[in-house]
Amino acid sequence: AFFLTPEGEAYYYDKRHLFRMGQETEHFTAGSQRPVISYRGWNILLLVCYDLRFPVWSRNVNNEYDLLIYVANWPVPRRRVWDILLQARALENISYVCGVNRIGTDGNQIPYSGGSVIYSPKGDLLASVPDYEEGTATATLDLSVLREFRQKFPAWKDADAFSIRLWNE
């Protein structure tokens, strides 16, 4: 995934969790870094598709990020899971979450319905693109509202301490 700024800065994230059912493990090497991008006062974490199924990888330790962005090829048969997990990531991480999914049919005849959305840290749906349509979803994300909510509901202070050990280490 890439994050490009109007100022010409470029950031990238290599997908950590390769989708073995799609043979990604045979063709790609999993990423091992989880860079948090600072942009205009926001801390942003980029993740890709199947990473969504692994909540520990996206765990917002000490509120290190404010916005979690997933880009995906999430197919129609598992679309309900996409919706549930995106909302769960917003709630458990007390973070805004943006999920960007494709539409159409790929070369393997797998259909995609879209379902691009933006969730608030309280799990409220702020914006969405209609299924099977190209489009843009816009919402106003307020960093002061996020910080105030984190102060009033500091669940992150009670989270379990852990460290991630990658399988290839």
Predicted regions and their residues:
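Short, basic/aromatic-enriched C-terminal tail that caps enzymatic domains
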Residues: 138, 146-169
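CN hydrolase (nitrilase-like) catalytic-core segments centered on the catalytic cysteine
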Residues: 53-136
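Active-site catalytic loop in hydrolytic enzyme cores
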Residues: 1-63, 72, 77-84, 150-155, ...
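Hydrophobic residues at beta-strand termini and immediately following loops
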Residues: 13, 37, 100, 129, ...
